[in-house]
């Protein structure tokens, strides 16, 4: 039985740091594990310009513990009024690594998101020419579409037509949750990749609803049927290099999750690697973990892999029920459960 696992230091290709006290409280959890992270721009107000992106990056860097090497990779929040010149300028000058497309009102702080994706095709053409990645929250928001069908409908209505129209555009299909998304990514050209979260590998929709409402298992996109979870597991542990790690770690204070209208988001950062590794061990795929966590993402983004390594050891430990941060009390994914691996 393997007792330790050493891999190149991984990256998180999708997460939320928030801002202010919460940001300062959660950045260290990510920085201790990952060398880089794609940081979501859905603040209030959102990160829509190069100047805002540069300022947010400095705030994040100020929250990184002394002596820790961590690089935030910033994203621009796309709106119906996005200035393509500023966007591309931010990319070419190293402020932005990618741009983020939120359909309006699809998730937390997305009210300023895009209402007409096709109207932004000229912006996407500019991005494709520059080699800039488009990160997409792939859900429709129409009131007549069942919440469990939002991703499937988005593929048919928006993602497939966009890819057909601009096949040179690199698209990161973020936090995929369905076998439909897996099939789309596998069938598309190499400019389509996808991140998979730990929660969507561990839980199906029963985890939100059985035994009472479970608010700390509620995120967007919501977890789906068991058949979809199994398809995601297969993609992560034995699929092509198009799939890579992205936690979608999204901290909210405990009391805002446990309320009459609880916030969407799972705080996966504190035990992210241990959570993913549990899945790879269950699928007898420990030898595939480094590719998913450390190699596939850099290859998709055209960035070098990290030179450093990290080691996880088989040391069972209990995840605390909550964590006290500068931003308040937050409940981590796997709270109250035992994990078999621990980062040294």
From Swiss-Prot:
MF terms in GO: dihydroorotase activity; zinc ion binding
EC number: 3.5.2.3
Positions bound to Zn(2+) 2: 100, 137, 175
Protein name: Dihydroorotase
Binding locations of Zn(2+) 1: 14, 16, 100, 248
Biological process terms in GO annotation: 'de novo' pyrimidine nucleobase biosynthetic process; 'de novo' UMP biosynthetic process
Gene3D superfamilies tied to this protein: Metal-dependent hydrolases
Protein role: Catalyzes the reversible cyclization of carbamoyl aspartate to dihydroorotate.
A Pfam family of this chain: Amidohydro_1
Keywords, alphabetical: Hydrolase, Metal-binding, Pyrimidine biosynthesis, Zinc
Family designation: Belongs to the metallo-dependent hydrolases superfamily. DHOase family. Class II DHOase subfamily.
Subunit composition and interactions: Homodimer.
Residues the record lists as N6-carboxylysine modifications: 100
Organism: Erythrobacter litoralis (strain HTCC2594)
Any one cellular-component term (Gene Ontology): cytosol
Record text on cofactor binding: Binds 2 Zn(2+) ions per subunit.
Binding site for substrate: 16-18, 42, 137, 220, 252, 264
InterPro entries: Amidohydro-rel, DHOdimr, Dihydroorotase_CS, Metal_Hydrolase
Catalytic activity: (S)-dihydroorotate + H2O = N-carbamoyl-L-aspartate + H(+)
Active site positions: 248
Cofactor(s) recorded in Swiss-Prot or TrEMBL: Zn(2+)
Pathway this chain belongs to: Pyrimidine metabolism; UMP biosynthesis via de novo pathway; (S)-dihydroorotate from bicarbonate: step 3/3
Signal peptide: none
Tree of life domain: Bacteria
């Amino acid at each position: 039985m393997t007792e330790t696992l050493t891999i190149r230091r991984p990256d998180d290709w999708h997460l939320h740091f928030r801002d202010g006290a919460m940001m300062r409280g959660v950045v260290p959890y990510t920085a201790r594990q990952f060398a880089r992270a794609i940081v979501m721009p859905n603040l209030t107000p959102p990160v829509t310009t190069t100047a805002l992106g540069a300022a947010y990056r400095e705030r994040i860097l100020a929250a990184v513990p002394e002596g820790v090497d961590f690089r935030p990779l910033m994203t621009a929040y796309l709106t119906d009024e996005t200035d393509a010149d500023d966007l591309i300028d931010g990319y070419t000058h190293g402020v932005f690594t990618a741009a983020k497309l939120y359909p309006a009102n699809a998730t937390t702080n997305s009210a300023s998101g895009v209402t007409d994706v096709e109207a932004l095709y000229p912006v996407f053409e500019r991005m494709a020419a520059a080699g800039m990645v488009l990160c997409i929250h792939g859900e429709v928001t129409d009131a007549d579409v069942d919440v469990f069908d939002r991703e499937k409908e988005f593929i048919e209505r928006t993602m497939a037509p966009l890819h057909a129209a601009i096949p040179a555009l690199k698209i990161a299909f973020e936090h995929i949750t369905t076998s439909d998304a897996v099939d789309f990514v596998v069938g598309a050209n190499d400019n389509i990749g996808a991140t998979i979260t730990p929660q969507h590998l561990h839980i199906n929709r029963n985890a939100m609803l059985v035994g009472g409402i479970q608010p700390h298992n509620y995120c967007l996109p919501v977890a789906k049927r068991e058949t979809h979870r199994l398809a995601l597991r297969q993609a992560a542990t034995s699929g092509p290099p198009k799939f890579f790690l992205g936690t979608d770690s999204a901290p909210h204070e405990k009391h805002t999750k446990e309320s009459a209208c609880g916030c969407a988001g799972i705080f996966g950062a504190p035990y992210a690697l241990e959570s993913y590794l549990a899945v790879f061990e269950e699928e007898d795929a420990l030898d595939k973990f480094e590719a998913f966590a450390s190699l596939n993402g850099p290859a998709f983004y055209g960035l070098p892999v990290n030179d450093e390594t990290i080691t996880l050891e088989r040391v069972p430990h209990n995840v605390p029920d909550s964590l006290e941060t500068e931003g308040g009390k937050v409940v981590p994914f796997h709270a109250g459960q035992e994990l078999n691996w621990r980062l040294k």
